[in-house]
Amino acid sequence: MDIEAKQILSAGLASLNITASQEYCDTLIAYAELIEAGNHYHSFVAASGRDLVVKHILDSLAPVNIFTNLIAANRYNTIGDFGTGAGLPGIPLALTFPDIHFTLIDRMTKRIQFLESVIAKLSINNVTVLETQAEHCKMQFDIVTFRAFHPFEYKLFKKLFKLCTPNGVIAAYKGKQDRVHSEIIEI
């Protein structure tokens, strides 16, 4: 990863009010490099270098203050990341919240194998992976998150709310605000 991408990561973390040690930054960069290397085989994201840092790593961390408040106010300790793909947003969040347990869930074996490799290479101790579809998952989580793998639909939320603990929440990452509003209206 080039120097510009590293500088953008540092500046982005500062703008998100994330206090970042050198080890934390280095781990995020190492993770981005693993995604870049895995892209040749898995086609995870259509970005590399600076774009990968901005569109995927920093985007995954953008709501960190919301997560901080939810975790503190509700004593949450489990997060399920559905349709995680390359581990987005789960891995950046897991690195940010080392005391919270994350389960990264995907239905594709090759993605699960990639994630297991990433977790081992980066020595991430608060993450497990699960190969399944949302409707077959038997676990429940304090926070259920997903990153734009489906449009907002009643059926989707019905499935995801079943995966929440009684006081759990869904944290949905979506793109443009106008698109989010139009999808919510349809629900």
Regions found by a protein language model. Name each.
Residues 1-74, 80, 110-111, 117-125:
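Class I SAM-dependent transferase core
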Residues 24, 50, 94, 130-133:
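Short loop/turn and capping residues at structural boundaries
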Residues 61, 91, 158:
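Active-site phosphate/pyrophosphate- and oxyanion-stabilizing loops and adjacent acidic/basic residues
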Residues 83:
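Conserved glycine-centered beta->alpha loop in an early N-terminal alpha/beta scaffold
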Residues 86-99:
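Conserved SAM-binding loop of SAM-dependent methyltransferases across substrates and taxa
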Residues 99-187:
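S-adenosylmethionine
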